[in-house]
C-alpha cells in the first residue's frame, strides 16, 4: 500500500496515450443520429422495419459538414447502425441495410458519403456501431453474434479511411430470441487496435468515459485521472441514451460528482487516464422529429453547455440529427452558426501579450514565458517541491478583461487542483481542476495587475496555456 504522499505522486504520473491526447485537442465535435428511426419518427426501433422505409430524397453530407464547421466543431461521428440493426452501408454480412432500400436504387452508402465529405471539409470522421441488434437472429447466441459484430467492425475500420473514434453505446436489451448478448468487449477492442490504432474507443471503451448524464453538464472537478474501475462503464448500460425521465437529464449533484479527488483515489490500487466526454443533443431527441423543429436549443443555451464542458476539462459531443430529406434542418443550422459566432467573439481579443508576466517560481528549462508563447509543446513548471504558485500579469495601462483560459501540459500529467484569479487585489474567479482546458469567465473589469493563484496541486503545477481575453 502506498503512503498518501506516494499515492499523490502516483496520480500525478498518470498520463494520456497519444490517441487520447489527440482526441482531447479536438474539444468539440458532432454526433449525427441518422437511420431507420429518422423515417419511422422513433428513438429506438425494434428491428422489424422494412428497408424500403429508408429513402432520403436530398441527402447532402457536405451540408452536414458545413453545419458542423459553422459551430467550430472539428469532427463528426455517424450512427452507422443503431439498435434496430439497419446498416447505413451495404454490409456484406446482412441484408438489413441500404442495399435493400430504394435510396439510390440500393446502390448508396451513407457511410461513404459522410466519411468522404468529412475529409473534403477537413474534419475527422468517427463511427457509432450499436452492439445491441434487435434485428439479427444471432444476437444473444454468443460467439455467432460476436463474429457478425466483429465482421461489421472490420468493414467500417478498413473501408472508410482513418477513423478518429469508435463510439460504443452500452445498451444491452433482448434480441429476437428473448436473450441478451454478453458482449466480448476485449475482442472488439483488439480488432480496432489492430485496424485503427489511432482511434479512441469511447464510453464502453477504455479511452474516453461518459460524463454520467446527457443533459450537457459535467462535474465541478472533472478529473482525467480516476480509479481503474470506472473503465467498466457500469452506469452506461442503464443510463446512456434513455428516455428523458428526469434522472437522465438532471445535473450531477455533490453526491456523485466526486470521482477523482484525493479522498476518492486514496486507496485505489490502479489509476488510469480516462477523460470525460459530455454528450447531449441540440434537440429533445437524438433522432430527427419534425415536431421538435420549434424546440431546438438556442445558441445561448449551447454556448453555456460548451463553456461548461470544454471549459472544465471535458470534450463536448453535440448531436445534430439530419431530417428525412437527409439534410440538417434550418433551425439547427441557424443555432449552430450563431453559436460559432458567439464562441469566436469570446476569444477574439487576446490581450495576454500586452502584459509583463512573472511567476513566483519556475524550473530553468520551463519559464513562465513558455505558457504564453502559443506553442503546443512548451510549458511552464513551478520549481521542484512547489505545490502552489502565483503568476502575475502587469499591464502598462488599465486593461479590460473578462476571461482567462488555462491549460496544463498533459504529457506530464494532470496536477492542478484549485486556484483563484485576482484583479488589482479583488478576487474575480475561482476554479478547481484545469486539465486540458479551464475557461474562467467573470464580469468585465479594468485591471493593471492580474494575478493567477494556484492554491493546490499534485506535485509541481504546469501550464502549457495561459491566455487573457478582453
Which functions belong to the PLM regions below?
Residues 1-387, 393, 405-407, 414, ...:
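Mature catalytic domains of secreted/periplasmic carbohydrate-active enzymes
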Residues 388, 396-403, 447:
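Extended extracellular/luminal ectodomain segments enriched in beta-structured repeat modules
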Residues 398-400, 411, 457:
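Short, surface-exposed acidic/glycine-rich loop or hinge patches that mediate macromolecular interfaces
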Residues 401, 416-418, 449:
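Exposed beta-strand and adjacent loop surfaces of beta-rich binding modules
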Residues 427-428, 470:
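Long, charged, low-complexity intrinsically disordered regions
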Residues 447-453:
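Extracellular beta-strand ligand-recognition surfaces/modules
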Residues 458-470:
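Edge beta-strands of jelly-roll/beta-sandwich modules across compartments, strongly enriched
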Amino acid at each position: 500500500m502506498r503512503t498518501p504522499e506516494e499515492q499523490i505522486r502516483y496520480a500525478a504520473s498518470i498520463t494520456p496515450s497519444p490517441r487520447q491526447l489527440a482526441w482531447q485537442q479536438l474539444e468539440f465535435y458532432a454526433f449525427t443520429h441518422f437511420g431507420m428511426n429518422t423515417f419511422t419518427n422513433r428513438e429506438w426501433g425494434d428491428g422489424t422495419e422494412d428497408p424500403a422505409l429508408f429513402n432520403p430524397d436530398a441527402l447532402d453530407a457536405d451540408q452536414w459538414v458545413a453545419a458542423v464547421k459553422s459551430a467550430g466543431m472539428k469532427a463528426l461521428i455517424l450512427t452507422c447502425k443503431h439498435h434496430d440493426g439497419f446498416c447505413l452501408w451495404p454490409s456484406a454480412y446482412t441484408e438489413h441495410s441500404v442495399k435493400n432500400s430504394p435510396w439510390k436504387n440500393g446502390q448508396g452508402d451513407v457511410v461513404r458519403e459522410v466519411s468522404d465529405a468529412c475529409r473534403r471539409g477537413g474534419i475527422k470522421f468517427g463511427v457509432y456501431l450499436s452492439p445491441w441488434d434487435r434485428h439479427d437472429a444471432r444476437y444473444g447466441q454468443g460467439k455467432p453474434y460476436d463474429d457478425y459484430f466483429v465482421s461489421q467492425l472490420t468493414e467500417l475500420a478498413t473501408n472508410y479511411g482513418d477513423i478518429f473514434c469508435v463510439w460504443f453505446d452500452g445498451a444491452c436489451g433482448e434480441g429476437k430470441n428473448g436473450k441478451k448478448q454478453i458482449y466480448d468487449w476485449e475482442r472488439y477492442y483488439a480488432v480496432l487496435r489492430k485496424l485503427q490504432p489511432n482511434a479512441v474507443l469511447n464510453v464502453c471503451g477504455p479511452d474516453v468515459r461518459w460524463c454520467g448524464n446527457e443533459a450537457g453538464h459535467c462535474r465541478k472537478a472533472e478529473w482525467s485521472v480516476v480509479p481503474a474501475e470506472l473503465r467498466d462503464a457500469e452506469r452506461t448500460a442503464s443510463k446512456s441514451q434513455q428516455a428523458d425521465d428526469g434522472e437522465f437529464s438532471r445535473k450531477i449533484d455533490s453526491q456523485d460528482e466526486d470521482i477523482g479527488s484525493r479522498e476518492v483515489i486514496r486507496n485505489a490500487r490502479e489509476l488510469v487516464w480516462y477523460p470525460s466526454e459530455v454528450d447531449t443533443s441540440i434537440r429533445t431527441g437524438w433522432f430527427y422529429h419534425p415536431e421538435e423543429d420549434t424546440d431546438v436549443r438556442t445558441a445561448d443555451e449551447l454556448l453555456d453547455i460548451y463553456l461548461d464542458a470544454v471549459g472544465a476539462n471535458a470534450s463536448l459531443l453535440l448531436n445534430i440529427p439530419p431530417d428525412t430529406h437527409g439534410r440538417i434542418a434550418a433551425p439547427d443550422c441557424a443555432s449552430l452558426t450563431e453559436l460559432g459566432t458567439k464562441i469566436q467573439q469570446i476569444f477574439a481579443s487576446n490581450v495576454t501579450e500586452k502584459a509583463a508576466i512573472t511567476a513566483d517560481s519556475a524550473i530553468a528549462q520551463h519559464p513562465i514565458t513558455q505558457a504564453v508563447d502559443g506553442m503546443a509543446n512548451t510549458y511552464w513548471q513551478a520549481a521542484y517541491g512547489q505545490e502552489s504558485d502565483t503568476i502575475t500579469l502587469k499591464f502598462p495601462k488599465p486593461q479590460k478583461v473578462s476571461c482567462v483560459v488555462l491549460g496544463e501540459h498533459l504529457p506530464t500529467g494532470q496536477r492542478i487542483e484549485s486556484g483563484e484569479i485576482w484583479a488589482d487585489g479583488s478576487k474575480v474567479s475561482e476554479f478547481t481542476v484545469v486539465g486540458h482546458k479551464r475557461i474562467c469567465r467573470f464580469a468585465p473589469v479594468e485591471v493593471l495587475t492580474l494575478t493567477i493563484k494556484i492554491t493546490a496541486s499534485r506535485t509541481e503545477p504546469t501550464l502549457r496555456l495561459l491566455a487573457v481575453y478582453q
